[in-house]
Amino acid sequence: TANRYHNADLPQREFDADKAAYHYKKSGHSGKIQLSASDAAFAGAVDAAQLMANSAAEAGIEIEVIREPRDGYWSNVWNNDAKGWCACYWGGRPTEDWMFSAAYTNDTDWNDTAWKGTDASAKFNVLVKEGRAELDDNKRREIYAECQRLIYDDGGTICPLFNNYV
């Protein structure tokens, strides 16, 4: 990875239909979940959304993929509370702080997972500020590793793929 403080100790999660079904039932949600997608988000986003829907169906979770027009996707669909869950793309950021601050802190307009209001997200917000100010490289690494663990355990990102930057 290009990120200096990448936490390589976090294992990649594998799809587990039984676990997905358990958590879906535990959530109290029932019925269809709508997923808005457009190839404006990234090339193949609609196909990726359909693949996710097919996998979710194995767990008894019905996802309705809504193909949105490319024109106006970022202003009319992405991060629009009325649309809810939607496909998006995050390009790499040069520093962990920039990525955390742009996408996950509770005070950013781009927090498209709406990760707010949990003990973990509150701790994350404090740690991001501490990490930004920390001059000791080893301490900063520990802080950012914990930030990544909090996102991994409590955040709302579903990341079906990673882009390879060469």
Predicted regions span which residues?
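Loop/turn elements at helix/coil->beta-strand transitions in domains of secreted/extracellular proteins
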Residues: H29-Q34, A57-E62, D81-W85, D154-T157
